[in-house]
Amino acid sequence: MAPLKFPPVNRYLITSALPYANGPIHIGHLAGAYLPADIYTRFLKFKGFDAIHICGTDEHGVAITLAAYKEGISPRQLVDKYHDRIKKDFELMGIEFDHFSRTTRKIHYETSQKFFLRLHEKGYFEKRKVKQFYSPQEGKFLPDRYIIGTCPYCGYEEARGDQCEKCGRQLEPTQLINPRSAISGSSLELRETVHWFFKLSSLKRELEEWLKDKDWKPFVKEFALSWVEEIEDRAITRDLDWGVPVPLEDPDAKGKVLYVWFDAPIGYISATIEYLPDRWEDYWKDPQAKIIHFIGKDNIVFHTVIWPAMLMAHGEYNLPYDVPANAFLNLMGRKLSTSRGYAIWADELVNSVGQDIARYAIALYIPEKDDTDFNVREAFERTNSELVDSFGNLAHRVLSFINANFGGRVPHPNSLTSEDEELLNYISEKVSNYERNLLNYNFRLAQKDAVELSNAINRYFEHRRPWKLVKENPDRAKTVLFLSYQALKIVSALFYPYVPNSVMKLWDYMNLPAGKFDDFVKVSPDLAGNTIKESKVLYRKVEEDKINEWVDILNKRAGNERISIEDFKKVKMVI
């Protein structure tokens, strides 16, 4: 059994990868970096620890300028538009950030430029003449993402100049076969220019020593170590007019900005400063604080090698404690594609099935180790079975029975039987497993623990037949309902990080006092006599017709025929 991965401190800085402000959020984003981080942070807070969840939109780089070009608007207009959209998407999904910032804010520019200057003063940068692709047709040097070509490693013909999306390898534009402009498709030529390089190779030994003892997900650690083996210095400036200006008087710095993957992770620091101007150092400089970065696997190299190297070079900040990266989420056997519109967007999913169903369904497919396929039919059928039929039904039958047979007051128990003790022992075992799994980032196993406990409590209730006991053995009926109420309280604590909105409604129906996780998962004798409220049904099933409609929608999108808003409006919205 894996050890409980829970550092002996009480201060945690949790971050989710900063989403590019160039489009809305889809289920792949949610499953990879945002829902797992939200579940994890909610649990830490429930445990009573000082934990903050920091995020914000990444608003620089060629991903932004390219998207703005395609939409026919300025980069500023684009990021303003999508910052608001992304923030709303997260709110709809119940993703709760303590602070959600932007990398175009003044505090971020100041923090990034100070960071750059410190590394510059310490000798970690070197100005080099390099040959870079120039587009005669467009009359300018092209940054890496403005260049596409064939990946030299896997042969993917649409690889970007910075990374191949298919095999995940980091690339330099000059490595591409048959490079061309991503905008015009025109051929390119190499010309000489100047850029500042981060001397990553000088930190190779430090990175290896730091990484070798890390108790991380195996695939994350292996990826990082393999990348460090072949580490090379990287240019951290770009020829762009959108971004954080290089803060040097050098004439060669004119018209250059910081590479987006240099300034973006500094956004974690600037957002924390913005949120807690008087306490931010408690999270970034106190060696007892733990920083945990939730990301997708395409960002592993940046968060496990380049970002730690930047922090090492700076010398004043904590290094990441853990980087629980997740793999990719596929959809109905196909790769998600925002450009082709093949995705399920956060807002349409919540508007269709509600926040709780959406969160639960996505959590079932968090790609913790390998790329995972989200099957919409299976997802909704499992959610119906596990969340609605098991947990939701348990809550309804226990509270309804107390209201109907005990005047809405939790009965006082009598002596426990061996069957009662067996249930309590099973509860204790499941709670321990759940906590261990969740804190080791095994979110799907923790979710399974919650469901299995819910099923066991349902069986206990069903087999005791309280509707007969209340007539034939009232004292025994009181004990069964007291224990059922207590068990419902306990299992609700396990479901809380996954479906917080509905669980908080349940706690209100149960008239439970505020408390921490450790309080919730214990039997509380003082709740005997507690007056509960009239309860309402927590969840509604996703009906077969709606499941079929979703399958049809995705089949159309898979055929590169993005469904129109008129077609989508035909889907019944029942929340």
Give the predicted meaning of each segment.
Residues 1-11, 56, 128-137, 149-166, ...:
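Basic, alpha-helical terminal appendages of large translation-related enzymes
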Residues 3-55, 107-111, 177-404, 446-450, ...:
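Structured secondary-structure scaffolds
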